[in-house]
Amino acid sequence: MLAFVAGLGLSMLSYPVHAAPASGSDTVQGLFDALLVTMKHGRTLGQSGRFAQLAPVIRRSFDTASMARLSVGPTWTGLSEAQRQEVSESIGRYMSAIYADRFDSYEGQKLEVTGEQPVASGVMVKSRIIKANGEPVKVDYMMRRNGEGWLISDVYLDSAISEVATRRSEFAAILKNDGIDGLISALNRKADVLTGTTARSF
């Protein structure tokens, strides 16, 4: 009974509630707030629990359809709407699994938005992650307007390494050898391994 009550408490973690983000910085701050809540309960939640908590946060913070289109490259134009939806969901699920794996516990880390600047395709939000040992890591978020809010369309580590470009390079060989269905299966397998869950709608 105690185990059930404890599990119920974790399933009802209090995440910050945000209105439609008025700026790119608001979106990134909302992501950071949710990451910190998950990290502080990370060991108790476990990998699959962190994934369950973060998946909806990733869904509302990232433009996974745009990231999928750019990551898949020219193959995208030949996909049906159903395939586009499926690969977007599998990429979002894989991203959620990666975040659940990387942000697994809290040891005094800080996640800070440091500013934003307009760019041709939207705005770039500047941030830094202060590791437990005090080492800073610069992370920039490319933001695109989506309706009344802003979504993350790419992430740059140390202002240089594009997540979308990295994924496109990783996906190219899979697409060449196994096609889009092979890529979707590979992404879901990787997420399964990281989280101990089974693929379902993202």
Where are these regions (language model features)?
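Early exported N-terminus immediately downstream of N-terminal targeting peptides
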Residues: 21-99
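Short beta-strand edge/turn micro-motifs at domain boundaries
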Residues: 136-166
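Low-complexity, intrinsically disordered terminal/linker segments enriched in charged
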Residues: 156-202
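N-terminal signal peptide c-region/cleavage motif recognized by signal peptidases
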Residues: 14-16
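Surface-exposed, charged secondary-structure patches
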Residues: 94-137, 187-202
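Bacterial N-terminal signal peptides
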Residues: 3-12
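Surface-exposed, polar/charged faces of alpha-helical domains
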Residues: 22-23, 37, 41-45, 49, ...
